[in-house]
Swiss-Prot record:
This protein's UniProt keywords: Cholesterol metabolism, Cytoplasm, Glycoprotein, Golgi apparatus, Hydrolase, Lipid metabolism, Membrane, Metal-binding, Metalloprotease, Protease, Steroid metabolism, Sterol metabolism, Transmembrane, Transmembrane helix, Zinc
PANTHER family from the UniProt entry: MEMBRANE-BOUND TRANSCRIPTION FACTOR SITE-2 PROTEASE, PROTEASE M50 MEMBRANE-BOUND TRANSCRIPTION FACTOR SITE 2 PROTEASE
Gene: Mbtps2
Coiled coil segments of this chain: none
Entry's EC annotation: 3.4.24.85
Subcellular location(s) of the protein: Membrane; Cytoplasm; Golgi apparatus membrane
Family to which this protein belongs: Belongs to the peptidase M50A family.
Example GO molecular function: metal ion binding
Residues annotated as the enzyme's active site: 168
Residues in the signal sequence: none
Protein name (Swiss-Prot/TrEMBL): Membrane-bound transcription factor site-2 protease
Cytoplasmic-facing ranges: 1-3, 510-515
Segments traversing the membrane: 4-24, 75-95, 96-107, 141-165, 170-182, 183-205, 225-247, 443-460, 461-472, 489-509
Amino acid sequence: MIPVSLLVVVVGGWTAVYLADLVLKSSVYFKHSYEDWLENNGLSISPFHIRWQTSIFNRAFYSWGRRKARMLYQWFNFGMVFGVIAMFSSFFLLGKTLMQTLAQMMADSPSPYSSSSSSSSSSSSSSSSSSSLHNEQVLQVVVPGINLPVNQLTYFFAAVLISGVVHEIGHGIAAIREQVRFNGFGIFLFIIYPGAFVDLFTTHLQLISPVQQLRIFCAGIWHNFVLALLGILALVLLPVILLPFYYTGVGVLITEVAEDSPAIGPRGLFVGDLVTHLQDCPVTNVQDWNECLDTIAYEPQIGYCISASTLQQLSFPVRAYKRLDGSTECCNNHSLTDVCFSYRNNFNKRLHTCLPARKAVEATQVCRSNKDCKSGASSSFCIVPSLETHTRLIKVKHPPQIDMLYVGHPLHLHYTVSITSFIPRFNFLSIDLPVIVETFVKYLISLSGALAIVNAVPCFALDGQWILNSFLDATLTSVIGDNDVKDLIGFFILLGGSVLLAANVTLGLWMVTAR
């Protein structure tokens, strides 16, 4: 749910701005001077919308647009080809996204025949829904406070603004390259959404050829696509860029542990700890951490080898009983240090025993069965923690501290512990800086790429509308002599694109906010 405080700040702030604007424009004393000030500074204010336009960047735009004319010609030709391909590809992408959303809605809807499903079927559906997370959609609706953390709004809006500015710079340079008069550049704020725009002389735009128009209209999404590619390159090269100050490949560094995290405590994880293993799974970077947790979550609980003499020494008589999910519990004292283990004796009979977890699993090798523990003459058993269905016992190695024994769902560890692959070489360096840079670049890649895809959709009021019109003018004018037929074809394509985009946005919003 969207935080109430965020809504109050947004609505209250806009109300104050609009009322101040209304009062000043209604004032006998300040009306003319205030309106002159707005006009001189290129400002305009309306409900939930502030717009600023200036001509101070015109010289820079004209300089960019007239420099290396031949190279720019080839550059925007590439952009034109990309824009046309992106326009038609957007239909396929939106159609696929819509089908994925509908399939997800059907999967989330309770079946009338499943009201009395067993615990095993419940476990199966939970597992399948979790695995579907790996098949994420390319396009997703983002709502601040719901699927966009409030503490990452700065990254989001900064990336949106930069993507918008780069988009409009593309339009502006292409327009000047095609001899269209450039009036100015501006920035706007709509509710909480920042953006940019360029003001072009419409008459000049209508007089140039359809191919020239295509170069201008495709330039924005082309620049967004290139920006996303540069972001990917920067992300890949980030370890090299930060190499003089940070090193990687030896583990993951803990940057934050949430207050409600199960990993918090005297023998838990602390900021600055270096994690090298999860169970027997080596961790050298963030990707390893995520893959290890996935493996632990979706595979059966791993066991630990223990000698028969140690098992006899640590265990004590217990009475085992079944939990509601079918698993077995045998520790009746509600101890935070004891865990119920199961194992098979020499006669292959399954037994249960309650053991102090740390003494049982410390300095032992992992196993799947008794065969994995056959070493030397002493008899050993593979003891497996008997836990609830989705709960795991995870041994987290973070030397030089003693291993942390985590009992809980692996996803809780994933969501409540923040990590980074970058370890500072010097104590004065911040452990958060690489995370900040990495997070911002990821937002820039996602949002610039999304802006390129969405703007390419042949939809009313988007770049795709003008790309489509210019494309039809360039290709169908000589084939279809009747302009009305050509306009009708364009209208139905635009209508289809608009409906497809609206359906994706509507269902996407419903999926995000209703669940």
